[in-house]
């Protein structure tokens, strides 16, 4: 069964509060061009034809999600998120019917600039190891000690910066996350859970504009990238 012969489902963990953003609401609900970041992100997934539906993992006491028009879309399913990203993703995976037949794309709620071209590249990988978008490191990488002094310089030829989406067979990822959480491992993305289970996910070169809005200065950058994309689309019409 090829990746495209499987049902493609997106899971978006959106239960975080984004404390580094220093805003009065979670970062996924900040606005760019009249829409929340979450709406831009989910819109990019819903307009990608292979995606059957999108599962949003939302904080149980989230007061914002029901105000958004996207919740009325029949292709949106909402589940309660967990205390960590891994738990939120796992809750989303458990909501998938027939997971053995599903290829899941897990995507950050605060990455609104994802392109369909990058999604195409991910789906070209068809084995049980799965694949993630990532960028080869271009800066010199320093490893620090506990005093924030340099302990050594890493070989950047082997360093990649992980992005999302991260794409795996839903059933395999579900088992990997359950196992990692049971072992108390520090799981910061889905690939790390797969690695802990013995898999070796593929690295697919992504784009530098697929940024995660994390700090205040990122908001203006995401706004710029989305504006540029809109301008190109209007020019090509």
Curated annotation (Swiss-Prot):
GO biological process terms on file: isopentenyl diphosphate biosynthetic process, methylerythritol 4-phosphate pathway
GO molecular function, one term: 2-C-methyl-D-erythritol 4-phosphate cytidylyltransferase activity
InterPro entries: IspD (IPR001228), IspD/TarI (IPR034683), IspD/TarI_cytidylyltransf_bact (IPR050088), ISPD_synthase_CS (IPR018294), Nucleotide-diphossugar_trans (IPR029044)
Disulfide bonds: none
Residues the record marks as site: Positions MEP for the nucleophilic attack: 156, 212
Annotated keywords: Isoprene biosynthesis, Nucleotidyltransferase, Transferase
Pathway named in the protein's UniProt entry: Isoprenoid biosynthesis; isopentenyl diphosphate biosynthesis via DXP pathway; isopentenyl diphosphate from 1-deoxy-D-xylulose 5-phosphate: step 2/6
EC numbers for this chain: 2.7.7.60
CDD domains: CDP-ME_synthetase (cd02516)
This protein's record includes keyword Nucleotidyltransferase: yes
Catalysis: reaction(s): 2-C-methyl-D-erythritol 4-phosphate + CTP + H(+) = 4-CDP-2-C-methyl-D-erythritol + diphosphate
Site (Transition state stabilizer): 20, 27
Family matches, as NCBIfam families: ispD
Function: Catalyzes the formation of 4-diphosphocytidyl-2-C-methyl-D-erythritol from CTP and 2-C-methyl-D-erythritol 4-phosphate (MEP).
Cited HAMAP family: IspD
UniProt family annotation: Belongs to the IspD/TarI cytidylyltransferase family. IspD subfamily.
Name recorded for this polypeptide: 2-C-methyl-D-erythritol 4-phosphate cytidylyltransferase
């Amino acid at each position: 069964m090829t990746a495209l012969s499987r049902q493609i489902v997106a899971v978006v963990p959106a239960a975080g509060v984004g404390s580094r953003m220093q805003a009065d609401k979670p970062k996924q609900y900040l606005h760019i061009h009249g829409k929340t970041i979450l709406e831009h992100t989910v819109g990019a997934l819903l307009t990608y034809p292979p995606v059957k539906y999108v599962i949003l993992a939302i904080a149980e006491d989230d007061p914002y999600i029901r105000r958004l028009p996207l919740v009325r879309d029949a292709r949106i399913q909402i589940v309660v998120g967990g205390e960590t990203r891994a738990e939120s993703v796992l809750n989303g995976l458990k909501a998938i019917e027939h997971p053995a037949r599903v290829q899941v794309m897990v995507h950050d709620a605060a990455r609104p600039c994802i392109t369909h071209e990058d999604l195409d590249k991910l789906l070209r990988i068809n084995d049980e190891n799965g694949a993630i978008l990532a960028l080869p490191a271009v800066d010199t990488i320093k490893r620090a000690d506990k005093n924030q002094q340099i302990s050594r310089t890493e070989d950047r030829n082997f360093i990649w910066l992980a992005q999302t989406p991260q794409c795996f067979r839903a059933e395999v990822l579900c088992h990997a996350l359950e196992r990692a959480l049971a072992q108390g491992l520090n799981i910061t993305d889905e690939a790390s859970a797969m690695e802990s289970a013995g898999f070796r996910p593929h690295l697919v070169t992504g784009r530098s504009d697929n940024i995660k809005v994390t700090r205040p200065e990122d908001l203006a950058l995401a706004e710029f990238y989305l504006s540029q994309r809109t301008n190109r689309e209007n020019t090509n019409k």
